[in-house]
Amino acid sequence: MLTDQEKIDLVNALDFVVIEPHTQSIYVHNDEKTNGVLAKVLHTISVDEYIESFKKGSLIDIFPAAMQEAGAEGFKDGQFVIMPKKFYVDQCYAMSKEIERLTNLNNLHNIKPNTYQGLIH
C-alpha cells in the first residue's frame, strides 16, 4: 500500500493541462498514464466511476482524487502538497506576531477600537 506522499508524487507526475483556481479544478488528459495513477490512488470509488464523475470533454479533474483520496492538503507552487504541522504552527506564530504588532501600534497612537480618528492626520 502506498503512503500519502507516494500517492501525491504519482499525481504530481501527471501533466496538468488546465488549472482553474476559481473552481478548484485541475485537469489532466484522460489517458493510460492517468488511469494508472487513478488505479493506485483511488480507494473509495472505481476508476471508471471517477472518470465518469469528473470528466470534462477529453480531460479529467484530478483535484478531488488528490485531495480526498491521495491525502493532499493543498496546491502550492504548481504541485499538490502535504503541509507539515510546522507549517501551521509557523502560520499561527506569524499571525500572533502581527496581532501583537497591530495592538502595540494602536496603543502607541491611542487609537480606540472601531475608530479611524487616530489614523487621519
Curated annotation (Swiss-Prot):
It comes from the Bacteria. The gene is yorW. This is SPbeta prophage-derived uncharacterized protein YorW.
